Amino acid sequence: MKTKVFGIGFHKTATTSLAKALSYLGYRVTGPNWVDNPNIAEEVYEMAFELANRFDAFQDNPWPILYKELDRKFPSSKFILTLRASDEWIRSVVNHFSEKEMPMREWIYGVGHPKGNEDVYIARYERHNREVLEYFKDRSEQLLVLNITAGEGWTKLCPFLGEHIPSVGFPRANTASEREKLRKRESFWPRRMYITFRRRAKRLMTSSIAR
């Protein structure tokens, strides 16, 4: 049985890349796991502990907020704090979430969306990272700090987990360049369908006139 691994870095710190890496190593991964009820605290712990009994690895919301409770309930677990520079992080958060309100984010930050609330989000992000480091300061065998966006990957992750280093590259998922490619693909097909429709309509009109 795999040791439980909790990713406790905030979203937009390469949590999806971490999930793909853990999955490649054979872990059963879950997250993000959302609760849409505005009274989120009433449901999140029950949901999290139920999932914790079914999976090996966990990332994104709500796991970063629950690390103390998870440590007490699963004392032999390992924790991974993914992070990145605060200015890079907030740009990514704003680009991704903008003004979209979510109960989960309101529970974490006190306000439901980052746009216009950048200082609030950065303060919460930096406080979380400081508190995690303080909490695990005498237990380095249980906490790995990993900056995937700066190029860290298998060579830090695998020794920490006691896994062999794979010969494949470390996964890089949900990057800005990937999202831009997806946006272009999604915008390409409506244009293509419109052009095809116009051409067919023009041929039909020409055919009708010829008759």
Where are these regions (language model features)?
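The conserved 3'-phosphoadenosine-5'-phosphosulfate
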Residues: N33-E43, S86, E134-D138, Q142-T196, ...
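Hydrophobic/aromatic beta-strand patches that form the interior of the parallel beta-sheet core
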Residues: T30, K78-I80, L144-L146
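PAPS-dependent sulfotransferase catalytic core
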Residues: M1-R54, L204, R211
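Short His-Asn-centered micro-motif
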Residues: I8-G9, N33, Q59-W63, L83-R84, ...
